[in-house]
Amino acid sequence: VQTPMCKALCTEVANQVAYDSIQIHGGTGFMRDFNAERFYRDARITNIYEGTTQLQVVAAIGGVIQRANDTRIAELQSLKFEGKLARLKKKLDELYKKHLESVKFVADKKDTNYHDLMSRSLVDNETYVFVGYLMLRDALKDSERENLAERYILDAIPEFEKRYMTIMSDDFTLIDNHRAIIDY
């Protein structure tokens, strides 16, 4: 489950960084005279080489539902954090608890359409939590990484919450109206 999660995260981040670099450079960033154009083109194709993000989600969702990462997450949670890192761990623990709730919510539905619709959000949230704990572990080993861990976790919280709210919304309108939306 960790390999497809990692591939999905890395390819999506590569695309976002490349996109942002073009925005930073304005119109000149997309000209062939600059590396930003090549990075953007290469980042877009990386998803195809690695399998689209959706294929990575399909590969990861079974492990997310079956809780394949729980043992590793428990190991990371058992590390002793102090100060800022302890406060960040508490935030991650809260996200993890919500994530387990949302996984159970989807699994208990036994509705394949809802399961498929929420798979990406579940995999993304699993990734936010897992990577957050990894970042804390690394910050524990090297204090220079504390700010990186803090930034990652604080940025992940609203992204996680958005997906969590979507999962828990029990909203079937996209499923119910998919033909009208697709055929529009």
Q: What are the roles of these predicted feature ranges?
A:
Residues 1-184:
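Flavin-dependent oxidoreductase catalytic core characteristic
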